[in-house]
Swiss-Prot record:
Chief place of localization: nucleus
One Gene Ontology term of the molecular function aspect: centromeric DNA binding
CC per GO annotation: condensed chromosome, centromeric region; kinetochore; nucleus
Alphabetically ordered keywords of this record: Cell cycle, Cell division, Centromere, Chromosome, DNA-binding, Kinetochore, Mitosis, Nucleus, Phosphoprotein, Repeat
Subunit and partners: Component of the inner kinetochore constitutive centromere-associated network (CCAN) (also known as central kinetochore CTF19 complex in yeast), which is composed of at least AME1, CHL4, CNN1, CTF3, CTF19, IML3, MCM16, MCM21, MCM22, MHF1, MHF2, MIF2, NKP1, NKP2, OKP1 and WIP1. Interacts with CBF1.
Cited function: Component of the kinetochore, a multiprotein complex that assembles on centromeric DNA and attaches chromosomes to spindle microtubules, mediating chromosome segregation and sister chromatid segregation during meiosis and mitosis. Component of the inner kinetochore constitutive centromere-associated network (CCAN), which serves as a structural platform for outer kinetochore assembly.
Biased segments, Basic residues type: 335-345
Compositionally biased region (Polar residues): 56-65, 96-108, 151-163
Annotated Gene3D superfamilies: Jelly Rolls
Biased composition (Basic and acidic residues): 263-275
Protein name as it appears in the record: Inner kinetochore subunit MIF2
Organism (species): Saccharomyces cerevisiae (strain ATCC 204508 / S288c)
Compartments, record wording: Nucleus; Chromosome, Centromere; Chromosome, Centromere, Kinetochore
Keyword Phosphoprotein in record: yes
Amino acid sequence: MDYMKLGLKSRKTGIDVKQDIPKDEYSMENIDDFFKDDETSLISMRRKSRRKSSLFLPSTLNGDTKNVLPPFLQSYKSQDDEVVQSPSGKGDGSRRSSLLSHQSNFLSPANDFEPIEEEPEQEENDIRGNDFATPITQKLSKPTYKRKYSTRYSLDTSESPSVRLTPDRITNKNVYSDVPDLVADEDDDDRVNTSLNTSDNALLEDELEDDGFIPESEEDGDYIESDSSLDSGSDSASDSDGDNTYQEVEEEAEVNTNDNEDDYIRRQASDVVRTDSIIDRNGLRKSTRVKVAPLQYWRNEKIVYKRKSNKPVLDIDKIVTYDESEDEEEILAAQRRKKQKKKPTPTRPYNYVPTGRPRGRPKKDPNAKENLIPEDPNEDIIERIESGGIENGEWLKHGILEANVKISDTKEETKDEIIAFAPNLSQTEQVKDTKDENFALEIMFDKHKEYFASGILKLPAISGQKKLSNSFRTYITFHVIQGIVEVTVCKNKFLSVKGSTFQIPAFNEYAIANRGNDEAKMFFVQVTVSEDANDDNDKELDSTFDTFG
């Protein structure tokens, strides 16, 4: 099949597509005009001529008929130009032509043929439409045949070359003549040849098979020579010569038919497969393909191919690459070092919003806690005191200051007593941990505890408390150094935080509990009054604040 004629010529009928066909208002061609038979086509001529005659007429008909060759065979004139007279007496003469008929599969000494009968109506219709019809053939009625006849023709192959009408094919009636399926059925046992017909005369073969009639002159392997080679007076020796010539041409046709594009591609593919890999002694195949690194096409790097053999592949001739000079390599290295040393410039965060407030939770500053604690303005002075750079601060190293003081108002008598404690130091510490109470008491000054005492009260976190007790004749003053405490005085409750001060009057019940998450520290001072203090409530004490005034 010629694929270059797709859409131009019918594959099966051989009808050419009409180019100048009138179209209707919808730009559509008339289907009758589109498939109208071309009178000048070779297939239509052969079809019409084939329908007019059965190709093999009897030697004698019923008295009034005459042996006349079909019109399409009258062109083959014999060399002896033998004149045949009509029995009717009209004097119409015709030259008898020799018909070359050779069967492709077998030869018999005497070829006996029985004419194929056709219906009179169909024959008459075909005769009316045929331009080659003769008056004699038009008068023929339905023939009745009395005997069979045989024909023999000599074939001279020495002078002119033979002309091949149709390609070789198997004349087996069981062969499926239509286009085979691409996938054969499993239950199809009667399949001999499922290959597509790709010969040059496939169109003509399909036409002849569709008509259901295969003329003897068009059987596969028949050849027709020029007019000069036809000889009606040939004997059996000429038949044998023609058979030998036919076999030689048949072998040549088989070679030409098989030598198609598919076979050529298969041969080339086998050559490529055998050379594209190396098989070692273990049977492993190693590819010989050339591996090329990715090319920089922007630098005009490319692979140049060239055909070095008859194989259907191209071989690599050369690979064009770009080589950087030493100066360029040094420049690139310097640029890399510069990028590494360059500090990143401060830029806006990826979540920057024009409102000025970034999205999401801000990052925690590790130095935030240190900034919350205010710096001690006396830090430098404390360092100088601890180092001994300032006078009157040496006792802090010992923790307790004991000095000589007066002990009487009337007498000039002095005595050494403890008058100061360093931070986190006390004279004694008492801890009480029971079911109802949990606290610690640091006593600092208690030499005259029947009148006066002072110290620090500590309440542990969560569970620290001092149960409800009576103050009797003692006044107690507390200053909260750390934490949060809940104070109960008589029937009153209140909270005290860091830096606050509260007092417990005499003759009242009081209780203290820790309500914070850390330890609570309170400095206290207590003073005990005499028993007759209630009698002197109305008297004025002139010396109460004389020491601060």
